[in-house]
């Protein structure tokens, strides 16, 4: 199977987000890459589901809480930017302070 670099990156996000979700369900706190992967995946899927950029910017800050991540991780993530595919094209979604509470 031949994948473009963009397709490889998306596949890596899916795998990392799946691992993060499983660890979170087991009660483990997520590290930096796991937290970023899970938020990124949810934003990408939200775009595919037809949500707007504004909706995703708000939703992105509700996916994880400080209790879901290891100490210091929330402070390390100032923003997450995702180039997502919407029904009307590709757009940049930026979530500032994605882990707020």
Curated annotation (Swiss-Prot):
Subcellular location: Cytoplasm
Enzyme class: hydrolase
Keywords annotated in UniProt: Cytoplasm, Hydrolase
GO terms (BP aspect): urea catabolic process
Top-rank taxon, per record: Bacteria
Annotated Pfam families: Urease_gamma
InterPro entries registered for this protein in UniProt: Urease_gamma, Urease_gamma/gamma-beta_su, Urease_gamma_sf, Urease_subunit
GO MF terms held by the record: nickel cation binding; urease activity
Principal localisation: cytoplasm
EC number, as in UniProt: 3.5.1.5
Pathway(s) served: Nitrogen metabolism; urea degradation; CO(2) and NH(3) from urea (urease route): step 1/1
Family as reported in the entry's similarity comment: Belongs to the urease gamma subunit family.
Cited PANTHER family: UREASE
Subunit structure, interactors included: Heterotrimer of UreA (gamma), UreB (beta) and UreC (alpha) subunits. Three heterotrimers associate to form the active enzyme.
HAMAP family, A to Z: Urease_gamma
Name listed for the protein in its UniProt record: Urease subunit gamma
Species per Swiss-Prot/TrEMBL record: Geobacillus kaustophilus (strain HTA426)
Recorded name of the encoding gene: ureA
């Amino acid at each position: 199977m031949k994948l473009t670099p963009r397709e490889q990156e998306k596949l890596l996000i899916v795998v990392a987000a799946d691992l993060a979700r499983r660890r979170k369900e087991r009660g483990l706190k997520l590290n930096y890459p796991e937290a970023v992967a899970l938020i990124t995946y949810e934003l990408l899927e939200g775009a595919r589901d037809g949500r707007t950029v504004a909706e995703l910017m708000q939703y992105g800050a509700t996916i994880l809480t400080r209790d879901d991540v290891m100490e210091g991780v929330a402070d390390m993530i100032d923003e997450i930017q995702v180039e997502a595919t919407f029904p009307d094209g590709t757009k940049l979604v930026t979530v500032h302070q994605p882990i707020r509470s």
